Every structure is written in structure tokens, then in C-alpha cells.
Amino acid sequence: MPVKFPSLKFEQLKQLVLVAAIAVFCVSCSHVPDLAFNPWQEIALETDSTFADIAFTEDPNHGWLVGTKETIFETTDGGDTWEQKLIDLGEEKASFSAVSFSGNEGWITGKPSILLHTTDGGQTWARIPLSEKLPGAPYSIIALGPQTAEMITDLGAIYKTTNGGKNWKALVEGAVGVARTIQRSTDGRYVAVSARGNFYSTWAPGQTEWTPHNRNSSRRLQTMGYGKDGQLWLLARGGQLQFSTDPDAEEWSDVIAPQDKGSWGLLDLSFRTPEEVWVAGASGNLLMSQDGGQTWAKDTGVEDIPANLYRVVFLSPEKGFVLGQDGILLKYNPSTEVAMVP
């Protein structure tokens, strides 16, 4: 006896086939090419800290790496191996946020109210006392020359010293408020993203106040920074990237989505060369563009790293590092050819 299938089930089957076809089409559209070679070497460090910053002395092989949980590492071979160091801060539980060197003079900032100074490449570190009235906690510092540095707090208060930290001059009258991220350009400008990512502020030398700017889309801002030529860039929630098209930070390029998968969070961006861009993100996500951000490729050699990659730092086109959580550190290997596989 012939079996009759209800028409409803047949319609359901057609819908399932259609959904499957759409899914396959979307996957093919959102595919990001892979890099043929992985130019990053994972450096094994025995710590579960999240790294915040890295800097080198006048000796290109001698560097320092800092992070949470009072973490400080030193290298004397260009970053291939690292030795953990301890600095006695008493009973305070510090979280280091930045390190910077000019020659052999260096500075380290951290919470709560931590500022360290060295004049001998880090053989000895002295703690610089900070006023209890300091607006916010030290967020970052830039060594500018002998006895000279510029420090910014997490509330956007900017100070400069020219005598090794004995005295500080305020460069801005008003704070910006609690900031999510703050970055400085090579010519001394700053951009700060608000704690909730709903607006950003800019400051330039000579200005007395921060200038607030509304974000240009419904997506909350993740972080912002400056490219090699001083051009602003931004990363927004959902894995979106934009570059500024005017010096006033009011006009922006069309949205670029390095990955057409909104679930991937992008956390930092850095230029290796004027055209080669690297973007790091959650769950070992590392992407590269060779044409200034127009097309992208994914470094699948690091995608199995079970950690967020928070910072990409290129000290030169040949020397770069990726800083992550749980003690993850990647070192750029320029001898590895970088090529895209379609």
C-alpha cells in the first residue's frame, strides 16, 4: 500500500534545506584566508598574569615585561628567554600597567599609585612617592629623555617631570573621567575611550582641556589608538574597525570587518609597517592585513591558544610582541615568510 507523506512535513523539509544552503553560503562568504606561515613564536613563561606592556633599554637585547599580580620579567637576549624579577613593595598588592625606557632610564606605573624609576637599565628600581590627591591611578608613562617623562592617570590627568620625578607639572586642567583605554601618539596627542565605550576624548599639547567626541555608530567602542602617521583608528564591539579621515577625529572611513563574525572581539591593533596591520582579540584571535586594512588573513597557528590576546606591540618592523592573559607572550620572527593562502 503506498505511503502518503503529509504536505506539511515536505514543506518543513524544504525549509531545512533552504536554511542549510543559506548557512553554507554565509560560511563561505565570511571565510577569512589563512596565513601560509605563522610568524609568531610562543614564549613559555611560568605565570598566570596578564601582561600589560613591554619595553627595551638602549641595549636592544635587554628588555622588561610587566603585568598584573606584581609581575615583572627581564630579558637579555632580545625576548627569547625571560627571568622573573621581584621588587619589594611591602604589603601592597600591585598591578603594573606600563613600562617605558629612554636609554637606560626607565619607568614603571601601576595600581595602587605605583611609580618606579631606574637609571641603570633596571639593576635597581626606586619608588617615586605620589600625592594622595593625584586624580586617579597611574595608567601609563612615556620616557622622553634624561630625567624627563610624561605620565597619565586612568582619569586622564597628564603630568610631566623634567627632574626624575621630584616634581610634576600638570598639562591639562580637567580630567576626562574613568577611561577604558588611553593611548598616546608619537607627537604627544592622546585619545581616551570612556569606561562604557559610549564616547571618546582627545587631547593635544597646548590644550587645557580634553575634547569629547560622540561615537559614530551604535556599537560601543573597545579601544582607540594612533597609526604610524598619527592617523586615528578605532575598534568597536562586534569586531569592527575604522580609520579617521581627518585630523580632527570627526570623520571616519567606512566600517571594516576583518572577520564577518560579530562574535569575535577585537582588542588591539598595531602597524608593523605603514601598510601591514595586525589585530589581536579574544581566544587566540590574530589577524593581519598587508594593504592597510582592506583585506585580511587569519593566523591559524595561534588560534588554539586558550587566552585573550590583549596587546600587539611593534618596537620596530623586525621586533614585535603580542601580550596576552595567563602568561601568554608571542614574539615576532621576521625570518618567517608571511603569505596569504586564499
Curated annotation (Swiss-Prot):
<dbReference type="GO" id="GO:0009523">
    <property type="term" value="C:photosystem II"/>
</dbReference>
<keyword id="KW-0604">Photosystem II</keyword>
<keyword id="KW-0732">Signal</keyword>
<protein>
    <recommendedName>
        <fullName>Photosystem II assembly lipoprotein Ycf48</fullName>
    </recommendedName>
</protein>
<feature type="short sequence motif" description="Arg-rich patch">
    <location>
        <begin position="196"/>
        <end position="220"/>
    </location>
</feature>
<keyword id="KW-0564">Palmitate</keyword>
<dbReference type="GO" id="GO:0010207">
    <property type="term" value="P:photosystem II assembly"/>
</dbReference>
<feature type="lipid moiety-binding region" description="N-palmitoyl cysteine">
    <location>
        <position position="29"/>
    </location>
</feature>
<feature type="propeptide">
    <location>
        <begin position="340"/>
        <end position="342"/>
    </location>
</feature>
<keyword id="KW-0449">Lipoprotein</keyword>
<dbReference type="InterPro" id="IPR028203">
    <property type="entry name" value="PSII_CF48-like_dom"/>
</dbReference>
<dbReference type="GO" id="GO:0031676">
    <property type="term" value="C:plasma membrane-derived thylakoid membrane"/>
</dbReference>
<dbReference type="InterPro" id="IPR015943">
    <property type="entry name" value="WD40/YVTN_repeat-like_dom_sf"/>
</dbReference>
<keyword id="KW-0472">Membrane</keyword>
<comment type="subunit">
    <text>Part of early PSII assembly complexes which includes D1 (psbA) and PsbI; not found in mature PSII. By two-hybrid analysis in yeast interacts with precursor and intermediate forms of D1, but less with mature D1. Binds to the lumenal side of PSI and PSII complexes. Coimmunoprecipitates with YidC. Purified chlorophyll- and carotenoid-containing photosystem II (PSII) assembly intermediate complex RCII* (iD1, D1, D2, PsbE, PsbF, PsbI, Ycf39, Ycf48, HliC and HliD).</text>
</comment>
<keyword id="KW-0793">Thylakoid</keyword>
<keyword id="KW-0602">Photosynthesis</keyword>
<feature type="lipid moiety-binding region" description="S-diacylglycerol cysteine">
    <location>
        <position position="29"/>
    </location>
</feature>
<comment type="function">
    <text>A factor required for optimal assembly of photosystem II (PSII) which acts in the early stages of PSII assembly. Also plays a role in replacement of photodamaged D1 (psbA). May interact with precursor D1 to prevent its premature processing before association with D2 (psbD). May also play a role in chlorophyll insertion into chlorophyll-binding proteins. Increasing levels of chlorophyll precursors partially suppresses deletion of this protein, supporting the idea that Ycf48 assists YidC in synthesis of chlorophyll-binding proteins.</text>
</comment>
<feature type="signal peptide">
    <location>
        <begin position="1"/>
        <end position="28"/>
    </location>
</feature>
<dbReference type="GO" id="GO:0031977">
    <property type="term" value="C:thylakoid lumen"/>
</dbReference>
<dbReference type="Pfam" id="PF14870">
    <property type="entry name" value="PSII_BNR"/>
</dbReference>
<dbReference type="InterPro" id="IPR016705">
    <property type="entry name" value="Ycf48/Hcf136"/>
</dbReference>
<comment type="similarity">
    <text>Belongs to the Ycf48 family.</text>
</comment>
